[in-house]
Amino acid sequence: MQKYISEARLLLALAIPVILAQIAQTAMGFVDTVMAGGYSATDMAAVAIGTSIWLPAILFGHGLLLALTPVIAQLNGSGRRERIAHQVRQGFWLAGFVSVLIMLVLWNAGYIIRSMENIDPALADKAVGYLRALLWGAPGYLFFQVARNQCEGLAKTKPGMVMGFIGLLVNIPVNYIFIYGHFGMPELGGVGCGVATAAVYWVMFLAMVSYIKRARSMRDIRNEKGTAKPDPAVMKRLIQLGLPIALALFFEVTLFAVVALLVSPLGIVDVAGHQIALNFSSLMFVLPMSLAAAVTIRVGYRLGQGSTLDAQTAARTGLMVGVCMATLTAIFTVSLREQIALLYNDNPEVVTLAAHLMLLAAVYQISDSIQVIGSGILRGYKDTRSIFYITFTAYWVLGLPSGYILALTDLVVKPMGPAGFWIGFIIGLTSAAIMMMLRMRFLQRLPSVIILQRASR
């Protein structure tokens, strides 16, 4: 029992800074929305539309680079720290190549925006302008993620938290300058949010690099002088590990976007209630997601040390802590669902629907926690392909079709509206949790030699 308590302390010490970093990132988006809304409703809508396109694109790159964390954790655990710098250099090359592709997609996103039904031309122009300003931040964001993954792979999660809050503090005044045109800068409205956010990502990257160069704990990990050439073998391995994670993230984000589109014809009350419940459950999701990042680090580190039993302990502890957290958040959600809904809106119909949907959200808290921590465990074992297959099957083959049938058809029951989609979420997330656990058990029952061989690839 003592080993589980010790492991839980280590996991929480790693996870809490990740939680705070995620809060800072979420707050940046909130600040952009509020400050753009203070300028005009059109600018706020433009930022919202632009963000809905930016997020799937940048999260694809983010997911691709998540492969670095278990690789570095495993090298650190095995005492092969001299190889870490080379992995990081190749991570920067990969981030550079991916950012070019993302920038090309975002530059041409105007075709998607202008094809939206009945969109106001002025709104479309502002959304395109916002994206074309923001896209210059894509390299900065991805380079920052490489540096952050280096730190997190070495079990240093506090730097990412600190840089997140530095970014938030810089974002507010820079937003003000470019939205309203102060200190000789042009008045750009919502487009100014894109300029500010792009600048902030570069500031965060440069601040993180400055920290890494000065950190005593990383003195033995230094990039060699001059520009290192791309190493096709290392980059291929990073892509093999990272692409399934990237695709899983992409399909997860697009799933919620598709559901939002399917709910939109149902009316203002249904859309508002759905959005409130989804926004709140997304905030609660930060807890297990951050714990999953910590579990990846611990499992990778233990496998690097050559201890499959300690890796199992880290995995089991992560799941136990995650279930405890999810139970508390579910109780919190059920107890205060109406008060929470009132923070967003005071329309009685909207509050009633949102509170009802939050009950369904509370039902899947534990499943959601298990599936996301299970994903973190599999990343630690470098078993990333199964993450994609499980996620795609659970969300797109089981969750979305069942949600659609319940919400919009009378094949099973009378059309349930948004609640049908939320039952679909429960089906999808529970299926994902079961499949993640089955895959984890399969891996852990393999001979230790095979587990360590797979982890050292």
Curated annotation (Swiss-Prot):
> What is the source species?
Escherichia coli (strain SE11)
The record's subcellular location field reads: Cell inner membrane
Q: What does this protein do?
A: Multidrug efflux pump that functions probably as a Na(+)/drug antiporter.
Instruction: Give the UniProt record's GO annotations in the biological process aspect.
Output: sodium ion transport; xenobiotic transmembrane transport
Record-stated family: Belongs to the multi antimicrobial extrusion (MATE) (TC 2.A.66.1) family. MdtK subfamily.
First-listed, main subcellular location of the protein, grouped into a coarse class: membrane
What are the top taxonomic ranks of the organism? Answer: Bacteria, Pseudomonadati, Pseudomonadota, Gammaproteobacteria, Enterobacterales
Name used for this protein in its record: Multidrug resistance protein MdtK
UniProt-listed HAMAP family: MdtK
Q: What residue intervals traverse the membrane?
A: 11-31, 53-73, 93-113, 127-147, 160-180, 189-209, 243-263, 276-296, 314-334, 350-370, 387-407, 418-438
User: Corresponding gene?
Assistant: mdtK
GO function term, MF aspect, one: xenobiotic transmembrane transporter activity
All disulfide bonds of the chain are: none
Q: Which UniProt keywords apply?
A: Antiport, Cell inner membrane, Cell membrane, Ion transport, Membrane, Sodium, Sodium transport, Transmembrane, Transmembrane helix, Transport
The record gives the membrane topology as: Multi-pass membrane protein
Instruction: Give me the Gene Ontology terms describing cellular component.
Output: plasma membrane
